[in-house]
Amino acid sequence: MKKEKGYTYAQIANLSGVPLGTVQKIFSGETVNPRYDTLLALEHFFEEPLEVREHVSNRYERNGSYTVDDYSTLPDEQRVELIDGYFYDMASPTFGHQSIGGEIHRQIANFIVENGGNCRPFIAPVDVQLDCDEKTMVQPDVGIVCDSSKIQRFGVYGAPDFLVEVISPSTKKKDYTLKLSKYIEAGVREYWIVDYMQEKVLVYFFESDVYPVIYGFDKPVPVNIYDDNLKIDFTNIAKWLKDGME
C-alpha cells in the first residue's frame, strides 16, 4: 500500500505520528509484531473508505439499496459481491490466485478429515450471507464453518469462524479496509489476508489483544482457532511463485 500510494517512509511517519524508525522496521519486515497502538495509527493513516467506494460499479443505478434478492437475479457469469446494499464487481481470479486458495483449503481439509470434528472448510465461490440480513452477500476465498446450522443449500448463513482473502490489485483496498471491518463486526473469529506479491500473511485473530500478526512464507502460519494445532505451510506456494506463477 505504501508503494501504491507513493508515500516515503518520512511522509508516513509525519502524517501518522509513528516514529520514522518504527515505520522503516515494519515495512522492511524487521518488526514482525508491531504494537497494537502503532498498527491502529497506521491503519487509520491508510484507511480509504472513499477510494474503496470507487470500486463500486457505476452500472447499478440503485447502489446502496440492493438486497440479496437482487443479487440472486444476476446472471451466473456476473461476478459481484453485495456489501451494505452496494454491488462490487469482481474480476475473474488468476491461476495463481486460485492455486494459493486451493492449497490453503487442501491443508485445512486434510487436517479436519484426519482429526474429525464438526467444522467444515469451503473455497470460493460460496455465498456467505455474513450479517444474516438482506444487504450483504460476500464470497471469501477460503473459510471454515464450525456451526453446522449456518450451512445452508445456498451457502453460509452467518459469520464463518475463519476466513482467508488472497488479495489482488483490484481487491486490495476492499480486503484491507471494508472487509476487515465487516468481518470483525459480524463475529468472524479469525481473518487472514494473504498478500502473495509481498509474500506476507496478515493474521487477525480477533479473540487476541494483539493483531494483526505478520508472517512471511518462509515458515508455517498457525491457525489460531485450532490452538496452533493446525499450521499452513506456504512452501509449495513460495516455490510456485519462484517458478513464475502469477
PLM feature segments, named:
Residues 36-52:
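DNA major-groove recognition helix of helix-turn-helix/homeodomain DNA-binding modules
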Residues 61, 84-87, 92-105:
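Nuclease catalytic cores
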Residues 29, 49-84:
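Polyampholytic, low-complexity intrinsically disordered segments
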Residues 54-62, 106, 110-111, 119-120, ...:
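C-terminal interaction segment
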Residues 79, 191-193:
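Short, surface-exposed charged micro-motifs
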Residues 1-15:
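Short basic helix-loop element that most often maps to the first helix and adjoining turn
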Residues 17-34:
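Recognition helix of helix-turn-helix/homeodomain-like DNA-binding domains
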